[in-house]
Amino acid sequence: MLNYFNTALLMVQMILKKQDPSIKFGQMSVNDQGFYLDYLSQTLNINPEDFNKLIKSLAKLCSSAQPISLKTVDLKIANQLLSDQPYLLELINEAKEKTVNLATVDNHHYYLPMAQLVDNTKLVKAFNFQSVGGAYFKGDKDNLVMVRLNGFGFENDKVMQDYLEIIEEQKQRDHRRINKILELFTFNQLAGPGMPIWLPNGQIVRQLIGDYVHSVQKKFGFMAVNTPILGNVDLYKKSGHYNHYAKDMFPELALLDGDKMMLRPMTCPHHCLVYLNKPRNYYDLPMRLSEDALLHRYEASGGLTGLERVRAMTLLDNHIFCRLDQIKTEILNAYQVIKEVIGTFNLKFHRIDLSLHDPNDKQSFIDNEQMWARSENQLEDALKDLGLEYTKQVGEAAFYGPKIDFQVKTALNKIITVSTIQLDFSLPSEEKFDIKYKTKDNTYEQGVIIHLGIIGTYERFVATLLEQTKGALDLWLAPKQAVIIPVNNSVHLEGCNQLLEKLLARDLRVTVDSRDERLNKKIRDHQVNKIPVQIIIGDNELKNPDLITYRLYGQEDSNQLELTKFIELFKKP
């Protein structure tokens, strides 16, 4: 599929270049969602009404059956052959890749983001464009705006129609679209890009998730702490984040007294300060800390996407301070925490990655091969003890240590990291925070930190749940669990209110629909709004108020249960 998308991207470049020889191309990308192409033109102002005309031009190019050759060239040659594309060359040179993919058709050269390609234009016979809009060059709002064209190409119409059905399903599962129904969160430019505002319904969901995860943390021996959202710049210099992570942090805040502060992008340094609050002995360990931590990370404005990519997020963070002889036990324990929580939310691991450092990349990773060898071996041994299959991913470690990434395949076939276990010998070192403990022999030894991410941030996790469930959240998690609907307001409304009092007394989230509408319309409206339970009150229910007639979301048939058994449906995990 990617080879057809990549070839379609090439063919679009050819068509646009023919229509405007002076066109300038910018960023372009190909993935399993299709391709996008950024361009700048004085004459081509493409809008959705032009898509059919563009598709006809592509069909003619397909019929011309032009052979395509692909070659890999070094940067010097790429700069020569693409000399009329300054924006594209700026991106290529900044990427610092040693080689560049160039396609050649009829002695014209075109850049392509990947090497997968079909060898003739006649092989791509079906095209579609999803959207056209604006995009800042390099995703930076201070740069010029280019036109971004999104589309895809396939070998025939049948394959494309199948793909279009998948695209429609993606739209239905988009958490931003679902949010318009459930009203969980909002954004406002006055609050700032990427700064989510949780609405009442969203705060209910967020709090329920937190309460459950906190109960599991407590069961496994974690102690909650609370630390500031700001830290002195020296704290992040000491931890190493300032040197390795500065581009992803918000700028420094200069205070009147001369101190420089920064919004924290993570809590690890603060939790080290908790450990250092007093001397620790061998019997104090392991010390397991947890915190719902508000973090700020500077994401490029072009990359902000609903709750998936934000600048302010709350991480359910965990750090385990332990001895060397406790590492394996604590990793096994951390895995049990993850397994229990993820299972409750009906998620399954698609793949487990052992993320390792790249020994050839001294800038992105701490330069201490002995530390890397030790920590990577420890994590791999733990995975083997658990009997888990895993894939090694070189270059995907955190800058300070290796990690185990638990990947979930979403309903839209996206692979996302939900949970992580990271082993850290760097922050505890003498050069950093000097995390030590007194041994039985009254000597001091260096401790170890295990970073544990159970579900990541509330923001991304809620986005994942909405996508997985299509907004039909589990009954215990739904912000509005049930609605009571009278068959006739004048006759049955009082009975609805009496049942409402009983259910509210059981701490259930229930409302009465007293609108002056037809019964079928009320039922349909609450189905659209994904209310898990609809309770119908008519003459029979008034005669027997302890017998509940209800219908579950997505079901046509009604059910009946006695009130006490009905309430058990709402039980929390």
Curated annotation (Swiss-Prot):
Q: One GO biological process from the UniProt record?
A: threonyl-tRNA aminoacylation
Q: Which UniProt keywords apply?
A: Aminoacyl-tRNA synthetase, ATP-binding, Cytoplasm, Ligase, Metal-binding, Nucleotide-binding, Protein biosynthesis, RNA-binding, tRNA-binding, Zinc
| Catalytic activity, as annotated | tRNA(Thr) + L-threonine + ATP = L-threonyl-tRNA(Thr) + AMP + diphosphate + H(+)
Q: Which cofactors, if any, are listed as required?
A: Zn(2+)
Q: Where in the cell is it found?
A: Cytoplasm
| E.C. designation(s) | 6.1.1.3
One GO cellular-component annotation of the UniProt record comes to: cytoplasm
According to the lineage, what is the superkingdom?
A: Bacteria
Q: Which family is annotated?
A: Belongs to the class-II aminoacyl-tRNA synthetase family.
- Function comment: Catalyzes the attachment of threonine to tRNA(Thr) in a two-step reaction: L-threonine is first activated by ATP to form Thr-AMP and then transferred to the acceptor end of tRNA(Thr). Also edits incorrectly charged L-seryl-tRNA(Thr).
Record-given protein name? Threonine--tRNA ligase
Name the gene for this chain. thrS
